[in-house]
Amino acid sequence: MSFRSIVRGDSTVDVKDVKQVLRDECGFDDVDISPVDGDNWLSVPLVVNDEFFLKVVTVQNAWTHSLFTTARNLGARVSGNGPFFKTFGSPVEMARHEFESARRMREAGVRAPEPVEVIEGDGEAFLLFEYLDGFETLSDSELDGETVREVFRMLRRLHDDGLAHGDFSLENVLVVDGDVYFIDSTGVAEDGHDDAVAYDLACALGALSSRLSPSVVVDLASEFFDAGDLRHALDFVTVVRLRPGIEESFSLLELRTAVAEATGDAS
């Protein structure tokens, strides 16, 4: 069995049980459930009646999140920063954090699916969001300058409001009719906000540089982040390059060179 299989484990859910929970707790009469395709580690995503997006968070998902968080904090320490990622003690704690995070992002003017309800089940948790019909993840979308600019604008807005995403990736950005939405943020300690902001920026620079020229990505980021922000982000790019889903998909040398040129640090 591969390490990936061990970490992911078996986090399948009984659809009949899910339907019953929705009937009992949310007052649904007819419940039609369809799975969402994707490489999902931290929840089981489902679409309900083509109206709601449901994330089922299992004990296995919570364990996997804890393992990932430990690895990220270790990476932050190795880079000379952190640790600043928070762990959660249970599936319902994870779900409540994501509910609150989405609510706060929307209050800050950052587009995110509207959170509807958190339901505590028998060990697992159920997190209900509005369903964004016709969405694509950024990894599946055509990337252009305006979309990338909007990603950095929203990230800046998030940070200016004292928030951080903590798990930025192309899969955690949705595009609907040209509008950009953030999803799946993780927990960040308040006293680690500055480092978390730099980590967010490093993730965005790395992920977007896997699709576009690093010089183009850095130029667009520079419209919203100053030289100090870009330099601080470089503290984390080596760690970011090890993340599942990014995994050496961008050139460290090219990204570092692009940042050096943008900040005037090129020799």
Language-model segments: what does each one mean?
Residues 59, 74-84, 126-143, 187-188, ...:
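A glycine-centered beta->alpha junction motif in the catalytic cores
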Residues 185-266:
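C-lobe/activation-segment region of protein kinase-like
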Residues 121, 128-131, 135-137, 164-206, ...:
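Catalytic activation segment of kinase domains across protein kinase-like and atypical kinase folds
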Residues 114-124:
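Short beta-strand micro-motifs within the conserved protein kinase catalytic domain, predominantly
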Residues 41-94:
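ATP-binding glycine-rich loop module of kinase domains
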Residues 95-112, 135-171, 176:
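Conserved kinase catalytic-core helix
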Residues 17-25, 29, 120, 130, ...:
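An alpha-helical support segment within catalytic cores of ATP-dependent transferases
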Residues 1-41, 238-265:
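Juxta-kinase regulatory segment immediately upstream of eukaryotic protein kinase catalytic domains
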